[in-house]
Amino acid sequence: MSSIRNTHWCHRCQRAVWLRARDAVCSYCGGGFVEEIDIGPSRAHRDVERDPTFDLMEAFSAFMRSRLAERSYDREISGRLGSAGSESFSNLAPLLIFGGQAPFRLAGGDNSSVEAFVNGAAPGIGIARGTNAGDYFFGPGLEELIEQLSSGTHHRGPPPAPKSSIDALPTIKITQKHLKSSDSHCPVCKDEFELKSEAKQMPCHHIYHSDCIVPWLVQHNSCPVCRKELPSRGSSSSTQSSQNRSTNGRENSRRRNIFSNLWPFRSSSSSSTQNRRDTNNTATAEEGHYHHHQQQQQQHQHQHQQQQSHMGYSGWPFDY
């Protein structure tokens, strides 16, 4: 029996194996839970490599390619797929959606391969090895999976333009100069402008019909031609107020710095003056006390001299 006809499926490894001995033992894990695949010899190799669910996954891959093509304006997707060249969408291989396990690759027809696309995108989303992909894709999680893969949390371009900015767009009159230049047609509806009709002019000088550009700006804050974003009307005032607050803050800080620099000197000068005053007062008080003491001593001496001069005797009580 050839190796092709002896192809078995190991339920433990969850893959097809070729038994090299008579014993029904997997050559990879050594387990005995193997089952012979009942297929014809002419289609054995091709059917082992290509699972029947590949057709379903290829259909799902085609659906995803169409959804990605519709969202080609998305910068992140464009940057991610741009390196693959102009054939990036057509060269996408069939997708294998799985979750919770390590990625793996399976060979498909025409030398293609199945690539892992989502690894546990969300709880309950994905298929594990050995499960039937058809049971999952037609199950209750299909809408949730498609919504996550088609929208996800990718960047969707500029946010909507503010209503004040839309109302502030100038309205101009179409002249012969416009009709003779590249601005003769509206970039949205491709209709030619009529002479002396009104049009909305963007800050980038591209002009549009009002009915064409306003619905676009309600969803995208950018010019459809050059992608230049529409500035917010309050940005200038907010910038000016921020500059004023910054200027006032610097002035207040400068004033505080000046006062903080001057204050120690004023404090030192004031302290020195007060110290000098206290010293002078102390010296004056001490000097006054000294003069008062001198005057008292002089008065005592003067009184003592007067007493001695009035007595006039040598100390005897009687004169002879």
UniProtKB/Swiss-Prot annotation:
ZnF bounds (RING-type): 186-227
UniProt keyword terms in alphabetical order: Abscisic acid signaling pathway, Acetylation, Metal-binding, Stress response, Transferase, Ubl conjugation pathway, Zinc, Zinc-finger
GO BP terms in the entry: abscisic acid-activated signaling pathway; negative regulation of proline biosynthetic process; regulation of response to osmotic stress; response to osmotic stress; response to water deprivation
Modified residues (N-acetylserine): 2
Record region (Disordered): 229-320
Effect of loss of the gene: Reduced sensitivity to osmotic stress, dehydration and abscisic acid (ABA) during early seedling development. Increased proline accumulation and higher expression of stress-related genes (e.g. RAB18, RD29A, RD29B, AOX1A, ERD15, ERD1, COR15A, P5CS1 and P5CR) under drought stress. Lower production of malondialdehyde (MDA) upon drought stress. Slightly enhanced pollen tube growth. Impaired bZIP11 accumulation after rehydration following drought.
Record's function text: E3 ubiquitin-protein ligase that promotes osmotic stress and abscisic acid (ABA) responses. Negatively regulates drought-mediated control of early seedling development, probably by influencing proline content, water loss, membrane ion leakage and the expression of dehydration stress-related genes (e.g. RAB18, RD29A, RD29B, AOX1A, ERD15, ERD1, COR15A, P5CS1 and P5CR). Modulates bZIP11 accumulation during rehydration following drought.
Name of protein: E3 ubiquitin-protein ligase RZF1
UniProt source species: Arabidopsis thaliana (Mouse-ear cress)
Lineage: Eukaryota, Viridiplantae, Streptophyta, Embryophyta, Tracheophyta
